[in-house]
């Protein structure tokens, strides 16, 4: 994780007790064990080992994430949309549970499928359920791994599809980019309703009612 400074003021963890419980569980692994349980290189494992054994500086969450989805975000344009960011955008984390854009976190590595003495989905079930239970609806723009942390009666998924001369195709990398681009537009336009989401054009992907289902919104574009 590399830090990028956007001048965000930080806020405290939403689930400090849960993270404090997980920390010693991860701290028990040595470099070689981390290689095995996380399926990473030895070089990566030594870095992860340091995450849990050495004092680390805390940064605003959105300043640390660098995956494909996050690379689509025009974060330097968000300073007039911080209230929307805080109240409408949540980052799912196996280590921290849920994060606001400016929650202060230290670098870490953990996914929901890692074999620990506890089952992470069970561990996070109640706090995550209670956190989201009063929301009217939720739009998931994350992977199935992290979406599975959420239990809510109105959880919507976005299906990005390319129409290749009548053949409907889904490309994993294109989907990741489109998720980030959709989130970026939602933030910049402060989207609040499902109807507003359906008006978005995501790099050529537009809402398709025929391919959509009750809790799955399909966005389709012609394959170039």
Give each language-model segment a name.
Residues 1-99, 106-110:
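Near-N-terminal "mature-domain entry" segment
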Residues 75-224:
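Internal, well-folded beta-alpha domain core
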């Amino acid at each position: 994780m590399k830090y990028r400074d956007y001048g965000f003021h930080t806020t405290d963890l939403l689930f400090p007790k849960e993270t404090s419980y997980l920390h010693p569980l991860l701290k028990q692994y040595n470099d070689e064990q981390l290689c095995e349980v996380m399926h990473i290189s030895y070089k990566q494992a030594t870095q992860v080992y340091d995450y849990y054994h050495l004092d680390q500086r805390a940064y605003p969450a959105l300043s640390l994430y660098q995956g494909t989805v996050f690379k689509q975000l025009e974060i330097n344009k968000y300073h007039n949309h911080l209230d929307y960011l805080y109240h409408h955008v949540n980052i799912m984390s196996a280590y921290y549970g849920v994060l606001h854009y400016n929650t202060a976190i230290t670098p870490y590595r953990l996914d929901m499928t890692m074999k620990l003495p506890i089952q992470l989905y069970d561990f996070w079930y109640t706090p995550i359920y209670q956190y989201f239970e009063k929301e009217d609806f939720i739009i998931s723009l994350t992977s199935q791994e992290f979406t599975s942390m959420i239990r809510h009666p109105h959880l919507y998924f976005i299906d990005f599809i390319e129409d290749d001369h009548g053949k409907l195709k889904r490309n994993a990398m294109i989907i990741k980019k489109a998720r980030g681009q959709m989130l970026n537009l939602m933030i910049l336009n402060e989207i609040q309703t499902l109807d507003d989401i359906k008006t978005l054009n995501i790099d050529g992907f537009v809402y398709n009612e025929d391919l959509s289902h009750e809790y799955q919104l399909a966005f389709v574009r012609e394959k170039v």
